[in-house]
């Protein structure tokens, strides 16, 4: 099997794990990553903060969280771009995350509001702005239907180790046409 096919097999194995989402197999699944793999989830803002993991052991938290409740990840393996030079390769692919949302999202948002109101770090104005934005988004999205499909970009760097190709870096990102959700304030 050539390197291109081996990298495709790594991606197929990754996709299969996300399809099954068997939490009893998460440690075996994590063997797809190098020990020092860096994994950046959609909530990753800075190294070591939120969903920006600096090694395989900590990246396990992202995988478990995804498998428990993120949604149905589907990487378009037919449209992915795979390149490699020697023992290093890089991958880019369109993907989707599909989740069925429903009336329980109203209650979930209200639970968020309760916790937000107790947050002493935010000013009353900031709390109100978060409530207004989140409430509007919740109503808007639920009125559009219960099937919610996010477009996603999946990129990764892979390296060939003694026991095969492994993920050395991975990034999940959402395209956006409006203001991004995270804004750094000076």
Feature locations, PLM:
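Short, aromatic-enriched amphipathic alpha-helices that serve as compact interaction elements
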Residues: 3-25
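A solvent-exposed, acidic/Ser-Thr-rich amphipathic alpha-helical stretch
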Residues: 4-5, 25-94, 99-117
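Alpha-helical packing segments of well-folded alpha/beta enzyme cores
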Residues: 10, 14, 62, 154-156
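Short beta-strand edge/turn micro-motifs at domain boundaries
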Residues: 90, 104-132, 136-142, 146-183
């Amino acid at each position: 099997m050539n390197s291109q096919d081996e990298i495709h097999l790594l991606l197929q194995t990754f996709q299969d794990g996300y399809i099954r989402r068997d939490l009893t197999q998460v440690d075996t699944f994590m063997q797809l990553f190098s020990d020092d793999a860096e994994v950046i989830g959609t909530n990753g803002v800075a190294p070591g903060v939120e969903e920006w993991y600096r090694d395989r052991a900590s990246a396990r938290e992202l995988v478990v969280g995804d498998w428990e409740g993120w949604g149905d990840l589907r990487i378009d393996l037919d449209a992915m771009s795979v390149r490699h030079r020697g023992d290093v390769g890089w991958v880019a692919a369109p993907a989707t995350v599909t989740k069925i949302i429903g009336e329980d999202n109203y209650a979930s948002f209200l639970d968020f509001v309760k916790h937000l109101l107790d947050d002493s770090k935010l000013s009353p104005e900031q709390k109100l702005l978060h409530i207004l934005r989140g409430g509007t988004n919740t109503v808007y999205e639920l009125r559009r239907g219960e099937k919610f499909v996010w477009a996603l970009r999946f990129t990764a760097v892979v390296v060939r180790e003694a026991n095969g190709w492994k993920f050395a870096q991975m990034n999940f990102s959402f395209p956006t046409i409006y203001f991004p959700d995270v804004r750094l304030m000076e």
